[in-house]
Design a protein with these regions (language model features):
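ATP-binding/phosphotransfer module of carbohydrate and carboxylate kinases, centering on a glycine-rich
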Residues: 1-103, 107-127, 200-204, 260-404
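Short clusters of small/polar residues that mark proteolytic maturation junctions
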Residues: 53, 101, 159, 234-235
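Short glycine-aspartate micro-motif
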Residues: 65-67, 75-79, 136-140, 209-214, ...
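Short, acidic, Ser/Thr-enriched surface-loop or helix-capping motifs
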Residues: 91, 149, 224
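Glycine-rich phosphate-binding loop plus the immediately following alpha-helix
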Residues: 180, 184, 188, 245-280
Length: 404
């Protein structure tokens, strides 16, 4: 009960920014006497701070105001992409503290080389947090690959040519501070969490069911059903890149033919747009940036390639909507940048438009059914931060351990 009440107060202050004890009591139902004990404890833990005064109830004399603090503790996201390692930290209030990047050169089939880069960058980043006198609270490693097991391991990465790799175990062995204080997550799963949260703020009501699809170096995604992320029995649930869209179609890295990734993934679109040579010379990331630029300038071949990819994307969205019946489908990665050029219908259904048997629309018109992501390339890290902060704040008094 005590932890519940502490969390109740923290959550209330986070949502209402500057507030007073009487307002907290009114919203939470906690007695003022309880708050007299709870609030000093949360101030001591660095979660709340007193900030001057606010108008008293019914215009009475000013009273001390409270705000969420969280500036003493950092959460750190280490994201491995197809071309670089990114380490970013924020405090518990979500304020960015530092961001560092380093290319890893995409050494195919050599996880040790990527891990070397990640360790060097992470140690540099943690040393800088020490210099800033901000305590390391929790780390989240973000990986664009299916994960399985408990603790999770990388099952495989077609982008990097990895097989099964105990990425978390190797990082903890070389950075002891991560022991017991680090999570390994799939990039698209945490991006789905972040995009859902961003849309909730935008539309003003909860989103409990959402499908997120993204493409940059491959195709990934995440599904939220009844407020919970779909991970499956083995942790590899919802890998949309390998949904079959064309029997006997183009060969896929998974050894099948006609997978979503093979038919409408980056390499397929780049080849269709005449940018395969650039991808081979400069890498997929640079080629995708060129694709986006050409689309924005109206290049006919690029627009045709994106239109064909959009047809496949729309088919997959329809199939996934039949399976999950989400409130919305969000397209992230480069798809968000070229959303209009994909020509995907924003309101889908089965049957003729005039007599649809099933239609996916939002009756309150607060948002279209299919829409572009809001968070760009930072979506996965934003989701990682949300996950880490929520976990730390679920045990508010434990944060006293981080205060000297």
């Amino acid at each position: 009960m005590r932890t519940h009440n502490l969390c109740l107060v923290v959550d209330d202050v986070r949502r209402h920014r500057r507030t007073t004890r009487s307002e907290i009591s009114e919203r939470t139902g906690l007695a003022r006497a309880s708050l007299t004990a709870i609030i000093p404890e949360l101030v001591s833990a660095g979660l709340l701070k007193e900030v001057g005064s606010a108008s008293g109830p019914r215009g009475g004399r000013p009273v001390a105001a409270l705000e969420f603090d969280g500036s003493r503790v950092a959460v750190v996201a280490l994201e491995i992409t197809v071309g670089e390692v990114i380490v970013e930290s924020v405090d518990l209030g979500g304020r960015t503290l530092r961001i560092d990047r380093a290319p890893h050169g995409r050494p195919i089939g050599d996880p040790a080389a990527v891990i070397d880069t990640a360790v060097d960058l992470l140690l540099q980043h943690l040393n800088e947090l020490d210099r800033l006198s901000v305590a390391f609270g929790l780390g989240v490693v973000v990986m664009p690959a299916p994960l399985a097991g408990d603790p999770p391991v990388v099952v495989a990465s077609s982008d990097l040519g990895w097989g099964r790799v105990d990425l978390l175990g190797q990082l903890v062995a070389r950075v002891p501070r991560l022991e017991g204080a680090c999570l390994l997550v799939n990039d698209a799963n945490v991006a789905a969490i972040a995009e859902a949260a961003a849309l909730e703020v935008e539309v003003g009501h909860p989103l409990t069911d959402l499908v997120y699809l993204k493409s940059l170096t491959g195709i990934g995604g995440g599904a939220i059903v009844a407020g919970n992320l779909v991970t499956g029995a083995r942790g590899i649930g919802f890998e949309p890149g390998h949904v079959l869209v064309r029997a006997g179609g183009k060969p896929c890295t998974c050894a099948r033919h006609g997978c979503f990734n093979a038919e409408a993934g980056p390499e397929a679109v780049l080849e269709d747009a005449g940018l395969a040579d650039l991808a081979g010379r400069a890498g997929v990331t640079i080629a995708m940036a060129e694709l986006v630029d050409r689309a924005r300038s109206g290049d006919p071949r690029t627009l045709a390639a994106l239109g064909r990819a959009g047809e496949v994307i729309e088919t997959v969205i329809t199939d996934l909507s039949l399976a999950f019946d989400p409130q919305a489908v969000v397209l992230g990665g480069y798809w968000a940048d070229v959303f209009n050029h994909l020509r995907v219908s924003t309101d889908l259904g089965l049957g003729e438009p005039s007599a649809r048997t099933i239609a996916w629309t939002n009756s309150d018109e607060s948002m279209p059914f299919v829409l572009p992501g809001r968070l760009g390339a930072r979506a996965a890290r934003a989701g990682a931060f949300r996950l880490a902060i929520d976990r730390l704040l679920s045990e508010p008094t434990a944060l006293n351990n981080f205060n000297g």
